[in-house]
């Protein structure tokens, strides 16, 4: 049974660990879920977001280039997926009146602390992966 009064949940990167769990949990709660793997929805394609996102949707961006070591040698691809793609999603969401939840990483911080980081701590990524994910955060927030 679907909860018709709730907003549709749109998940990018639904083939990954976080996206798979989120889609399963949302469906188990009876939510209207549109879950897309990276093969089904390339978030680096700005036009694709315009066709998939509807007014009132809640878009959860789980899509990412997650190969931390690989990002060092494939910086262009990491930047495209982790920084440019979230910007496309955010602008499309802002245009149609959808909400965006962007999943990031603790790699945006330096990693040299023993206690948990707080949301307002300084960001000091130490590698390409962390830097591109931080760029994605900035791209997503600047659209709103």
Residue locations for each model-derived region?
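Helix C-cap/helix->beta junction micro-motif
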Residues: 29, 95-97, 143
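NAD(P)H-binding glycine-rich loop region in Rossmannoid oxidoreductase-like domains
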Residues: 43-81, 92-96
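Catalytic helix-loop patch of NAD(P)-dependent Rossmann-fold dehydrogenases
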Residues: 73, 80, 85-88, 108-144
């Amino acid at each position: 049974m679907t909860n018709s009064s709730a907003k549709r949940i749109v998940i990018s990167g639904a083939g990954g660990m976080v996206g798979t769990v989120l889609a399963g949990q949302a469906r188990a709660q009876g939510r209207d879920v549109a879950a897309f793997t990276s093969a089904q929805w390339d978030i680096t394609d700005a036009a694709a977001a315009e066709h998939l996102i509807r007014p009132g949707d809640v878009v959860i961006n789980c899509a990412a280039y997650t190969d931390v070591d690989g990002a060092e040698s494939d910086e262009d691809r990491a930047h495209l997926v982790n920084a440019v793609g979230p910007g496309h999603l955010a602008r499309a969401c802002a245009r149609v009146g959808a909400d965006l939840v962007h999943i990031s990483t603790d790699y945006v911080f330096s990693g040299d602390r023993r206690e948990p980081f707080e949301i307002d701590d300084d960001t000091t990524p130490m590698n390409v992966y962390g830097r591109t994910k931080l760029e994605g955060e900035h791209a997503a927030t600047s659209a709103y």
